[in-house]
């Protein structure tokens, strides 16, 4: 990966300018960065902001080339990312990569205790079946499948999709409590920590949206009607004005799309006969025998 170096302005004025695909600005070659794997080139500032944004939001895969039409579908290597971002952001990137590695490894899992969160090893023999796992750090014994306290001779409880395990290893999982900082995604079972803010949560692993308090799915609740009634009423964490503004934006988007279809429909109806006519002429021309 090439990085920018600064040179006197009189030298830069003589160099050809290269267009950045992200900001569409024109820069000298030395102000650009080339991704080694695919040779796509962007201005260094744009690529740096792109990488930092993905890391701060919590990436789920390797950082890919920002060009959606990249022919090689390249990815940034770790050394390229390290040259671009600050040390604390790079540390978070390595942590995210490690968490992803544990998530994909069938022989390793996280200790479910919120006060521990150590990595535990599973026995490779019978890995597809629930097995007893003992954390080497806090000595808690739990089920590898549902992460509940070990339950020999019993099936995994169906209501263990969302659980929270406090520091006391003798107590059972708590769920559906407003004050617990860690809960599990109802879809993929990954642990999610909520510091503060909005109660509408989105799992970074599976992109499932749900309510933090009652764990109900919000995937189809674009207007956040869920927080207008029931036990979660007015618990969204935003002012009433901000909720109304959000709903206005959503309704405006759908209304604009519908209006666009309404305006375009007469033109589509008028254009359809011409398209069909041209297609029929082309087909007729193909069927005519060649002159001899």
UniProtKB/Swiss-Prot annotation:
Cellular component annotations (GO), alphabetically ordered: membrane
InterPro entries for the chain: E3_UB_ligase_RBR, IBR_dom, TRIAD_supradom, Znf_RING, Znf_RING/FYVE/PHD, Znf_RING_CS
Binding site for Zn(2+) 3: 143, 146, 151, 156
Region (TRIAD supradomain): 16-236
Binding-site residues for Zn(2+) 1, renumbered to this chain: 20, 23, 43, 46
PROSITE patterns: TRIAD, ZF_RING_1, ZF_RING_2
Keywords, in A-Z order: Membrane, Metal-binding, Repeat, Transferase, Transmembrane, Transmembrane helix, Ubl conjugation pathway, Zinc, Zinc-finger
Residues reported in the UniProt entry to bind Zn(2+) 5: 211, 214, 226, 232
MF-aspect GO terms: ubiquitin-protein transferase activity; zinc ion binding
Cytoplasm as UniProt keyword: no
Recorded topology in the membrane: Single-pass membrane protein
Binding-site positions, Zn(2+) 4: 185, 188, 203, 206
Catalysis performed (reactions): [E2 ubiquitin-conjugating enzyme]-S-ubiquitinyl-L-cysteine + [acceptor protein]-L-lysine = [E2 ubiquitin-conjugating enzyme]-L-cysteine + [acceptor protein]-N(6)-ubiquitinyl-L-lysine
Pathway: Protein modification; protein ubiquitination
Cellular compartments annotated: Membrane
Active site per UniProt: 198
EC number: 2.3.2.31
Protein family (similarity comment): Belongs to the RBR family. RNF144 subfamily.
The protein's name in its UniProt record: Probable E3 ubiquitin-protein ligase RNF144A
Organism of origin: Xenopus tropicalis (Western clawed frog)
